[in-house]
């Protein structure tokens, strides 16, 4: 999979543009004239136009794109990585929400990001829980075990793929519950 820009005049039918922009699962936000990107496995990027070009962040954290406290590599548990991060500008700050493969339970996490011109100077705040699986459709009534990479064919004790958005000034988070068996929206206060 790759990412391209697609345009629409009516919001229903889209025309993909020719150039590939980069890796899969782009999520984008704009702050101070810069479009910040998050992609598969926590890769980060930026651009100044929706048409590109994309400047991809180098793997500056011992060969990884994110510091250990964000990616989960500091846990001592092998195989932990960001599944789908979402980068979001709100009130002049950049927020990153994500879930991590290998967490038990996989859940919606958050950290604040302070970007800089030099990728090595980017700062990532502490990671905190935004939401954990509740009983019923979110899977909180099921056994808890470390999540694995790939499609979830059954309902599991996991929340995945958080994405923040605003509506009438209120921040909300869309997410997958029960691993991939349902979609939820939760109000987020305090960002």
Feature-to-residue mapping (PLM):
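Beta-rich carbohydrate-recognition and catalytic domains
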Residues: 1-84, 88-157, 166-191
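Non-cytosolic head/periplasmic domains of membrane-anchored proteins
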Residues: 160-162
């Amino acid at each position: 999979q790759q990412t391209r820009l697609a345009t629409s005049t009516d919001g229903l039918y889209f025309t993909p543009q020719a150039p590939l922009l980069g890796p899969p699962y782009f999520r984008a936000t704009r702050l101070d004239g810069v479009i910040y990107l998050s992609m598969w496995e926590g890769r980060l990027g930026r651009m100044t136009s929706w048409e590109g070009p994309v400047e991809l962040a180098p793997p500056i954290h011992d060969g990884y794109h994110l510091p250990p406290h964000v990616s989960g590599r500091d846990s001592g548990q092998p195989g932990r990585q960001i599944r789908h991060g979402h980068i979001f500008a709100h009130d002049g700050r950049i927020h990153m929400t994500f879930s991590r493969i290998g967490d038990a339970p996989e859940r919606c996490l958050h950290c604040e990001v302070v970007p800089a011109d030099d990728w090595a100077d980017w700062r990532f705040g502490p990671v905190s829980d935004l939401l954990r699986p509740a009983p019923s459709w979110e899977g909180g009534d099921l056994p808890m075990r470390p999540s694995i990479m790939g499609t979830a064919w059954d309902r599991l004790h996991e929340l995945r793929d958080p994405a923040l958005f605003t509506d009438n000034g209120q921040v909300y988070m869309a997410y997958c519950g029960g691993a991939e068996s349902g979609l939820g929206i939760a109000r987020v206060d305090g960002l």
